[in-house]
Swiss-Prot record:
Protein name, per record: 3-phosphoshikimate 1-carboxyvinyltransferase
Cell compartments where the protein resides: Cytoplasm
The keyword Disulfide bond appears for this protein: no
Binding site for phosphoenolpyruvate: 22, 94, 122, 169, 346, 388
Organism superkingdom: Bacteria
Gene Ontology biological-process annotations: amino acid biosynthetic process; aromatic amino acid family biosynthetic process; chorismate biosynthetic process
Enzyme Commission number, as recorded: 2.5.1.19
Binding site for 3-phosphoshikimate: 22-23, 27, 167, 169, 315, 342
Task of the protein: Catalyzes the transfer of the enolpyruvyl moiety of phosphoenolpyruvate (PEP) to the 5-hydroxyl of shikimate-3-phosphate (S3P) to produce enolpyruvyl shikimate-3-phosphate and inorganic phosphate.
CDD domains: EPSP_synthase (cd01556)
Gene (UniProt): aroA
Length: 431
């Protein structure tokens, strides 16, 4: 299926469960593989990105059993990985490539990381540079900025690193390398990015300390296997949250969603726009906050989004842009230049597509201004191979005057394989 046409449907009512959190699923494989013992994972996201991570560790000698419900990772210990006999293919996954670069920097073997045509265009110098400071030997195209990356691992030195951007991928790559460094490795960010790595490192028994916008990891500490329960991904829930808000007479309950405070910027933004969003039955599972999310259709208004809210909602901006297009007034997004180096340039991609649907969008280097319309128009939208762009534009089709055809939608399997079947179920009002 390479394109889909979405037409307006009925109100969205009922309950649903979204796939497991992609970030937590990646990290459960990585830490489980280098821990001692067998780590079990329930709720693992079997999207293409996470399967790329799984394949990489299998290629390094890690036994991973998967019965479709429970994942069992037979850890090899901190120094038990084997040299892969071929290039490790990360597919479209920037998380796989950047975090693996950090982990592989500390291994006593040679490895090569590559990916698809989109991933090979994404900047890698942001992790290569600090890892090189630690003593890693990493070569790549464009002076180490573009994959494929060739990594000759070995002994690493601890560093203190001031990251120029708030990025969980940069932070996590350095933290993973820090497990193999001699001494204490620290990373500080301009503002705190998602902290799944810090939580999971602590759960597995790593020695770490957190401080204001930063973390310190002690090298040489062995990890121990855990039982992991992965909650639903709030980035996937975001599409249905926005869909319920903008579709009249809707009420959706999304069960078992991770509501880590470093990830709930989407909820804060949509509430500030007037959205009715309630967290129900808040609890903690595997060191992560979890809740059910109750959403009711709401009249939205434009707001300004900037500062520390941005990294807490960085992956949800395509969905936020659709909400802004349906809101009264203008929504201004600033401090969001990171969106330009995601799977695609998400600022440009959303601007182009929203204009196609009749929305006025003014683009700037670090963000955009979106002036909402009473009703979106129809048209042909392009995903640019970006799963979040494809899903956001499909949500727009729920409330458009005419059909929205979204091209190049196979990318959705990266993070939400059953997205379109769920969307169709609610769009048609099927039970």
């Amino acid at each position: 299926m390479n394109s889909i046409s979405i037409t307006p449907g009925s109100s969205l009512k009922g309950e649903l469960v979204v796939p497991g959190d992609k970030s937590i699923s990646h990290r459960s494989i990585m830490l489980g593989a280098i821990a001692n013992g067998v780590t079990t994972v329930r709720g693992f996201l079997r999207g293409e990105d996470n399967m790329a991570t799984m394949a990489a560790f299998r290629a390094m000698g890690v036994r991973i059993d998967d019965d479709g419900h429970l994942l069992s990772i037979h850890g090899r210990g901190l120094h038990g990985l084997e040299e892969p006999g071929d290039v490790l293919d990360c597919g479209n996954s920037g998380t796989s490539m950047r975090l693996l670069t950090g982990l592989l920097a500390g291994q006593n073997f040679f490895s090569v990381l590559s990916g698809d045509q989109y991933l090979r265009k994404r900047p890698m110098k942001r992790v290569v540079e600090p890892l090189s400071r630690m003593g890693a030997r990493i070569l790549g195209r464009a002076g180490g900025n573009l994959a494929p990356l060739a990594i000759s691992g070995g002994t690493l030195n601890a560093i203190g690193y001031e990251s120029p951007v708030s990025s969980a991928q940069i932070k996590s790559a350095i933290m993973l390398a820090g497990l193999y460094a001699d001494g204490d490795t620290s990373v500080r960010e301009p503002s705190l990015s998602r902290d799944h790595s810090e939580r999971m490192f602590a759960l597995f028994g790593a020695s770490l300390e957190t401080f204001h916008n930063g973390v310190t990891v002690k090298g040489g500490i062995e990890l121990h296997a855990q039982e992991i329960h992965v909650p639903g991904d709030i980035s996937s829930a975001a599409f249905f949250i926005v869909a319920a808000l903008i579709t009249p007479d809707s009420e959706l309950l999304i069960r078992n969603v991770g509501v880590n405070p470093t990830r709930t910027g989407i909820i804060d933004v949509l509430r500030s726009m007037g959205g009715s969003i309630e967290l129900v039955d808040e609890r903690e599972v595997s060191a992560e906050p979890v809740a059910d999310i109750l959403v009711r259709s709401s009249r939205l208004k434009g707001v300004r989004i900037e500062g520390q809210t941005v990294p807490r909602a960085i992956d949800e901006f395509p969905a936020i842009c659709v909400a802004a297009a349906c809101a009264e007034g203008t929504t201004s997004i600033r401090d969001a230049r990171e969106l330009r180096v995601k799977e695609t340039d998400r600022i440009s991609a959303m601007a182009v597509n929203l204009r196609t649907l009749g929305v006025t969008v003014d683009e700037c280097d670090e963000g955009m201004d979106i002036t909402g319309v009473e009703r979106l128009g129809g048209g042909v939208a392009e995903s640019f191979g970006d799963h979040r762009i494809a899903m956001s534009l499909s949500v727009a089709g729920l409330v458009s005057a005419d059909a929205v055809r979204v091209n190049d939608i196979d990318c959705v399997s990266t993070s939400f394989p059953n997205f379109f079947s769920l969307l169709e179920r609610f769009r048609t009002g099927a039970p």
